[in-house]
Amino acid sequence: TSTLLPHTSSAKKVSLTESFSLFAMMLWIFLDSALFESLSRDISISIWRDGYSLEIALFHIIGVVCALYFKIQKNQKELLIIILFALSYLFYFIQEALILSIVYPFVISFYNVVILQTLVKKDLKTLSIYMIFIGWIASGTGLFVALENLILFVPMLFLMALLKILNTQQIQHKEKTCLNSF
């Protein structure tokens, strides 16, 4: 844990100490980077140029507040983030700028808080390795997808991520059932 952050009660620490996998964090950064870079280059839809600044700012703040104060289980957070990214991509594909300017900033802020809560617990060496994968590889791959106009392949990633999350939940449910039977 960090010495720079205030200590919280043990009840709060339980929910904040959930670490998310490097795979999940890389996926979120990739999805964000690919959508952000695609949006930046798309002249047919722009949530920044089309006057949605208030919605964007408001839902960034709401995303931070929700990530900090709503206590939900790790798998539920992962599923929520994936669903919100899927909705963001859906609203991008169907050119629904208003709803995109609400959902996308919310998920950006929400997942960033979740990532920061995970990274703050890592030692410097581990953090350096994570930053290579998160900051360079995942974001660079997202940029590549946008530059090469491969954004339509992203829905396949949603399917793979959803299957991974559902499989993890099923395994945890089986383990819980097995432990409860003793």
Predicted regions, residues:
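C-terminal transmembrane helical hairpin of 12-TM major facilitator-type secondary transporters
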Residues: N75-I115
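Flexible interhelical linker loops that connect adjacent transmembrane helices
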Residues: T1-L27
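A late C-terminal transmembrane helix in Major Facilitator Superfamily
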Residues: K121-F158
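Alpha-helical transmembrane segments of polytopic membrane proteins
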Residues: T1, W48-G63, L100-I108, L152-L159
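Helix-to-loop junctions at the C-terminal end of transmembrane segments
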Residues: I61-E78
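Helix-loop boundary and gating motifs at the non-cytosolic
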Residues: A24-I47, L116
